């Protein structure tokens, strides 16, 4: 629980009024533009285009890295390529890490604290093998190629250790755990694999403590091994299908709420973390900000979100001092009276 002395709470309110951030902006306010809410930010650090930026997390991380690459940043994951017969999407999409468990494993592997053994996360199917640590839409390959590809991925992730900044995107709380090998996977094991191995695979729906424990471990490992800044964000892309038994709309709301709380707690704990509100910006547009499937973010909205990120972290422009003043009713009379007493 966050507790302030009463006087401090009123100081916070006064400061927020001066910054025009203490309540939702009217449509004439600077934090509202063309149907989007763009909250004023005070970044803890800045980024420069000569820096190496490593991106890790859910599919929205792919949107971020594509836009950053187009703006001249060195983004190692964006360079990862795969043959089209293995994966019909751009190569970086194969590297999606959907939950805090797989993100932790991947970061641990960079610093020698986790090893992807040849037996882990391999499912035999018609036509070859699938890697449960990777994207759900992969094509079967030979076991030899699967293991070779893992080495290629490991080489890409070694770039993380020499990166100036990280962008970590939290995606889901629904995850699958392999109790035989003690690891989380990204691709759900098939029903037949589960039936052949009773008691091996378990569905986990993480809560705030679960996510926080794993992400705390991630940041502590990173900070113990390198000096870097971290932009933490929550993906606005909803869950496509839920194993929870809940309506997917409710399951998604739970998922994003848990991740958003965890992100705030991480921001409060670590000085080298900044929270970037891509989730809040995207949702302020409503379903108009999504493609026809109501899952993928509209490409133009992605560009607006990244432009907003660049404005705050790269150009250093931050808040606009020439923004229009608040509308006359922006500060309620009751609040004015309370502040004057």
What does each of the following model-derived ranges do?
Residues 1-341:
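Extracellular glycan-modifying ectodomains
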């Amino acid at each position: 629980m966050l507790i302030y002395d009463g006087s401090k709470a009123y100081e916070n309110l006064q400061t927020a009024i001066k910054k025009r951030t203490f309540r939702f902006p009217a449509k004439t306010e600077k934090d509202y533009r063309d149907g989007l809410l763009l909250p004023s930010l005070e970044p803890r650090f800045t980024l420069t285009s000569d820096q190496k930026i490593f991106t890790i997390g859910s599919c929205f991380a792919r949107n971020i890295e594509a836009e950053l690459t187009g703006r001249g940043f060195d983004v190692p994951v964006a360079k990862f390529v795969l043959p089209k017969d293995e994966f019909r999407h751009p190569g970086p999409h194969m590297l999606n890490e959907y939950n805090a468990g797989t993100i932790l494993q991947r970061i641990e592997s960079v610093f020698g604290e986790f090893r992807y053994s040849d037996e882990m996360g391999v499912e035999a199917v018609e036509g070859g093998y699938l890697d449960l640590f990777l994207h759900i839409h992969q094509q079967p390959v030979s076991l030899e190629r699967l293991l070779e590809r893992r080495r290629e991925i490991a080489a890409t992730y070694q770039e993380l250790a020499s990166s100036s900044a990280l962008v970590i995107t939290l995606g889901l709380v629904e995850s699958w755990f392999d109790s035989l090998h003690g690891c989380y996977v990204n691709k759900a094991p098939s029903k037949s694999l589960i039936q052949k191995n009773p008691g091996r695979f378990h569905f986990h729906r993480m809560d705030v403590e679960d996510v926080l424990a794993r992400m705390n471990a991630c940041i502590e490992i990173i900070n113990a091994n390198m000096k870097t800044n971290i932009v933490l964000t929550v993906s606005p892309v909803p869950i496509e299908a839920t194993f929870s038994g809940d309506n997917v709309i409710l399951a998604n709301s739970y998922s994003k709420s848990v991740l958003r709380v965890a992100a705030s707690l991480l921001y409060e704990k670590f000085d080298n973390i900044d929270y970037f509100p891509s989730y809040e910006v995207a949702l302020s547009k409503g379903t108009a900000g999504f493609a026809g499937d109501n899952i993928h973010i509209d490409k133009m909205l992605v560009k607006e979100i990244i432009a907003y990120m660049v404005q705050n972290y790269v150009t250093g422009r931050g808040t606009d001092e020439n923004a229009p003043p608040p509308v006359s009713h922006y500060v309620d009379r009751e609040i004015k009276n309370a502040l004057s007493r």
